[in-house]
Amino acid sequence: MSLDGWEPFWLGPASHRLYAALHAASGAPETGVVLVPPLLHEMPRSRRFVTEVASELASLGLPALRFDFHGTGDSAGSGEGLDLASMHRDLDLATAALREKTRIRRLVLIAWRGGALAVRGWLERGGCADLILLWEPIVDGGAWVRELVEGDARERALRPPPRAGVARATDPSDGQLMGFPAPSRLRADLEKTRLDDGMHRHAVPVWAIVRDDLAALSMNIARRLPLPANAPSFSIGAAMDATFFLTPPVRELVGKLGQAVREEAWA
């Protein structure tokens, strides 16, 4: 079944089912892209945006596969089981599925925000790609968790009582951050993960799509693509129900990105 040029499907064993969708490209492309989603509350907000980016890349001749991590989105499983090790298995499944379905020779990963932290560990444990693109990546997992905890406390304080005489749900012991399950194992994984030059031990070129006001990444970036100032923001101060769209300036950026990926020469 195809929906507007892309095909949804399940991947992985019955015990670890992942929702995925392939945005196919015409011809016999040699390069394909796996889109690694952001984490927690940033994933549903950017779902339409990531879908539009995948379609745009496919129209440029780059087949793109997007997926939901196990325990998130439309994938099976509970968010209580979410940690970086599970995400690494999911990346194995997603990259293998794209290779199998398209017979590409070169693999590119585009990782949004916290998804970049998962990609770092995936490379450490033997994940193989030809190019990594980090889209507004979270550089310091520990600092991000602290930011989320503070933002979560503010959000809880603003919640109205569910009904008269019932207190607000402000107790963080429910294990959630920004309304999504964030088990202790996931928090511990994120807190000890940073993007640094260790990624380059794997001889994979790394590009970054960042805003001008983003602090310099503590790693060598082979190529930097500036994100338009008016691009949708992942800032924790943004409205929780805000949905991202592929605005004309960002669409132009994705076009330049796709062209650059197609022109990139791999040894």
Enumerate the language-model features and the residues they cover.
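Short, surface-exposed "cap/lid" segments of acyl-processing enzymes
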Residues: 15, 24-68
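Catalytic nucleophile-loop/oxyanion-hole region of alpha/beta-hydrolase
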Residues: 72-106
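Alpha/beta-hydrolase active-site loop signature
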Residues: 40, 69-74, 139
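N-terminal cap/lid segment of alpha/beta-hydrolase-fold proteins
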Residues: 1-31
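Short glycine-enriched, charge-decorated loop/helix-capping segments at active-site entrances
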Residues: 49-50, 78-83, 239-243
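Active-site signature of alpha/beta-hydrolase-fold catalytic machinery across serine-
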Residues: 121, 125
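Gly/Ala-rich beta-loop-alpha elbow adjacent to hydrolase catalytic centers
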Residues: 108-120, 136
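The alpha/beta-hydrolase serine catalytic core
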Residues: 126-267
